[in-house]
């Protein structure tokens, strides 16, 4: 306000409210030489014009409460649209979904992205078969994570183990463990070992008339029918 107003003498401002014209309040500011200035008194935005100055150096300040009313109307309309959209969506029961996570896995999250894309949507037995064939080093820990999720789904939530599929599996960055790699002539460099967090979500697929598979591949894949839970290198798949 001080940057926009020049002068030394004080001017009495008379604030006229839209709701009650009788209630007034006085403000003292330097004399106005600008055409238009804006200032917020408290929580209400006001506008001061040179053309509104009276002979007694009184300025009427109009309180703009229309903005607050418009925002309230907009928020109310937004809530109504959200409620209508929420009623149209079909909610999945929480007792049909299991989420488990594995913290501080010593592997890069970027190297696991391709594997997780292949695992998402598979049935539980098919996912275990794929993890038995993969060359990723944390595949054994990932199999233990999926087995733990299947145990929770079957014994705690009472879900059918034959109809479990992996709906989502993702990884998040955790931290880097630093170490020193020594080289010749007294030199060395820093090694950063990445760690990540892995989360998996499994759910029970709904039964459909005439279905031939469970999950993305299900019983139509050859490895599903030949895999019995243990990988044997001498056996042909």
From Swiss-Prot:
Sequence similarity: Belongs to the universal ribosomal protein uL22 family.
PANTHER family xrefs: CHLOROPLAST 50S RIBOSOMAL PROTEIN L22-RELATED, LARGE RIBOSOMAL SUBUNIT PROTEIN UL22M
GO cellular component terms attached to this protein's record: large ribosomal subunit; mitochondrion
Pfam families: Ribosomal_L22
InterPro entries: Ribosomal_uL22 (IPR001063), Ribosomal_uL22_bac/org-type (IPR047867), Ribosomal_uL22_sf (IPR036394)
Keyword Mitochondrion attached: yes
GO molecular function: structural constituent of ribosome
Subcellular location: Mitochondrion
Protein name: Large ribosomal subunit protein uL22m
GO biological process: translation
Keywords, comma-separated and alphabetical: Mitochondrion, Ribonucleoprotein, Ribosomal protein, Transit peptide
């Amino acid at each position: 306000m001080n940057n926009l107003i020049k002068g030394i003498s004080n001017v009495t401002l008379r604030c006229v409210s839209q709701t009650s014209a009788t209630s007034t309040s006085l403000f003292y500011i330097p004399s106005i030489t600008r055409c238009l200035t804006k200032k917020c008194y408290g929580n209400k935005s006001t506008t001061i014009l040179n053309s509104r100055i009276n002979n007694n150096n009184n300025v009427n300040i109009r309180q703009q409460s229309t903005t607050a009313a418009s925002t309230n109307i907009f928020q109310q309309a937004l809530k109504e649209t959200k409620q209508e959209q929420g009623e149209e969506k079909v909610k999945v029961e929480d007792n049909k979904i299991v989420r488990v996570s594995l913290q501080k896995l010593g592997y890069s999250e970027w190297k696991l992205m391709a594997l997780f894309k292949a695992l998402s949507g598979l049935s539980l037995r098919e996912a275990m078969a794929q993890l038995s064939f993969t060359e990723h080093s944390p595949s054994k820990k990932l199999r233990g994570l999926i087995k733990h999720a299947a145990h929770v789904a079957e014994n705690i939530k009472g879900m059918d183990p034959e109809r479990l599929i992996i709906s989502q599996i993702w990884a998040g960055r955790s931290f880097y463990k630093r170490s020193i790699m020594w080289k010749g002539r007294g030199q060395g460099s820093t090694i950063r070992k990445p760690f990540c967090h892995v989360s998996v979500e499994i759910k029970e697929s709904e039964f459909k008339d005439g279905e031939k598979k469970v999950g993305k591949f299900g019983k139509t894949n050859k490895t599903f029918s030949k895999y019995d839970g243990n990988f044997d290198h001498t056996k042909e798949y």
